[in-house]
């Protein structure tokens, strides 16, 4: 959501509570990003909720997940869609790029998120993509199923728009719930994409938590890290080291 030069850089599950206190960072003279106060956020409750809600997406056919993602991608490529307008408006100040560059990046990224592209991806990766949904016979004596982690924690840093959405999509294809911190320069697309997915299907409003926090000042506690299945990190060596340590 954006109003008067302020972008709310968070999308939390329906049942979670957003702290009343919000932090804000100015990314330009007339634009700021607002996000939940990290210390006030009940992270244990949020992680517990995402884990519990994972059953909803685990029962969703991967073809339906791909279709929903594809529809959002189409919206981002539709020059008359308000979602595209908002994405471009927020990308410019947050990533520090020109309007022309924002359009070029959005067009290139969105083309990789279409239903056709993602269907081809899973067909390349898996001989039978249905292994993402259930056990499939691979020979006369064996069956196989691909089972993603219950909760995926993705931590990003930097200013490359779209990286977070690609990571989010790959986790969704494995039917993981996702807790994501995008980099400040990449807050626009992951947050807006998560919101748009929630409009496509309520399942995504249960299993996605995408919000910014200042990774240099606030670190995820070890007890929280121990509850997630996998941690995916993008950024500098120092950024990744801060998570490991």
Describe the residue ranges of each PLM region.
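Alpha-helical scaffold segments in soluble metabolic enzymes
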Residues: 71, 192, 196, 242
């Amino acid at each position: 959501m954006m109003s008067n030069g302020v972008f709310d850089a968070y999308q939390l599950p329906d049942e979670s509570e957003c702290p009343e206190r919000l932090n804000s960072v100015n990314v330009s003279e007339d634009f700021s990003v607002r996000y939940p106060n990290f210390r006030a956020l009940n992270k244990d409750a949020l992680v517990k909720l995402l884990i519990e809600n994972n059953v909803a997406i685990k029962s969703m056919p991967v073809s339906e997940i791909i279709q929903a993602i594809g529809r959002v991608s189409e919206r981002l490529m539709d020059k008359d869609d308000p979602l595209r307008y908002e994405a471009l408006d927020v990308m410019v100040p947050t990533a520090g790029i020109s309007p022309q560059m924002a359009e070029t990046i959005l067009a290139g990224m969105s083309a990789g998120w279409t239903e056709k592209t993602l269907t081809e991806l899973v067909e390349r990766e898996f001989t039978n993509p249905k292994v993402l949904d259930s056990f499939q016979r691979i020979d006369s004596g064996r069956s196989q199923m691909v089972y993603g982690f219950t909760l995926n924690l993705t931590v990003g840093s930097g200013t490359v728009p779209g990286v977070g959405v690609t990571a989010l999509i790959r986790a969704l294809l494995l039917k993981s719930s996702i807790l994501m911190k995008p980099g400040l320069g990449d807050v626009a697309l992951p947050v807006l994409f998560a919101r748009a997915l929630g409009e496509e299907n309520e399942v995504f409003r249960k299993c996605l938590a995408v919000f910014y926090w200042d990774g240099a000042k606030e670190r995820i506690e070890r007890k929280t890290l121990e509850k997630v299945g996998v941690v995916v990190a993008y950024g500098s060596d120092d950024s990744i080291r801060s998570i490991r340590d």
